[in-house]
Amino acid sequence: QSIADDGVLYNRFHTTALCSPTRVALLTGRNHHSAGIGSVAEVATGAPGNDSVRPNTVATVAEMLRLNGYSTGCVGKAHQTPAWEVSMSGPFDRWPTGEGFEKFYGFVGGETNQWSPTLMLNTSPIEPPKTAEEGYHFSEDITDKAISWMRGLDVMTPDKPFFLYVSYGATHAPHHVSQEWIDKYKGKFDKGWDAVRDETLANMKAKGLVPENTELTGRPEGVEAWDDLDDTQKTVYARLMEAYAGMAEHTDAQVARLTDALKDMGKYDDTLFIYIAGDNGASAEGGLDGTFNELMALNGIPQVLEDILPRLDEIGGPTSFNHYPVGWAHAMNTPFQYTKQVASHYGGTSNAVAMSWPNGMEARGGVRQQWHHVIDIVPTILEAAGLPEPYLVNGAAQKPI
């Protein structure tokens, strides 16, 4: 919210309904099919536009900026690398360090354990600096690394511009966060997803984010009314959502650390800060019941809610790999229909964006209602940097942005 207060909020911003396609569109400014990633990298086919191989004719904004004198860094999740290239052997052309980022610290893939991630430093696997028992969390770790990198640049090359891509594993499953963050939402979802949808729509109308005559879409097939659920369902479902909400707020706290660091360095007012709330709509991948272990849901392994009840306090912790049920995904995509993976409906593609640049934008606290897409980010960055759209990058003629 503070970023929006310092700039503008975009409430009709859209992604591709999936992770990898959104990320390649974000980083290149081109349609995801023209960039070769029509779906998540792991399910690539040999079909044109869906082989997960970004061609050299589609350069990333990181490479464009690097070639124009910017320091470039990436921390967090990178999910636009072909699955067969994700190994210690490479090739590394489509890893972050091969796509214009001079530094990379994070993981390559769709998701990872937030307490014990599969970490990479550039192209080499490394162990986390400490364990979950010692207080480790991936979001905090990459925020530490991002701040350290920015401070190092500020000391060594204070006048050199930089481009930093911070891509949290949150709030993708598993929804891992410490108990103190989960406890902040204890009981807040006992009212159920139907009541939350009603409240969310009312708040959106009050803030002018949707027209006054906006109506809610119906529940997806198979999702029951909250009042029709039994006590076991309500207890488990509410707890899974508490963990998600705690993780979301914890992530916002890490973003606040980034802006605070920029302010401390005296660079915040001159920094174009773009906050994108996700690469797709809320996910239905937890199934109708949600799950204590998302890998069970993804592999079609049945679970019994009664088996989760004794482990409620473990949800969000190192022994879990949790994901909320579909009903909560529908609620979080209010007022739209459907969820992540469904590109035909705004429930899959609608993601809010906040953008600030105090010394570069006159607007403060406004809302932009125009229809925007993730491919609009790169031309915005180039215009802000005073750079033209490149026609050649490293000798390769570029597809138009």
Regions found by a protein language model. Give the residues of each.
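Formylglycine-dependent sulfatase
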Residues: 1-401
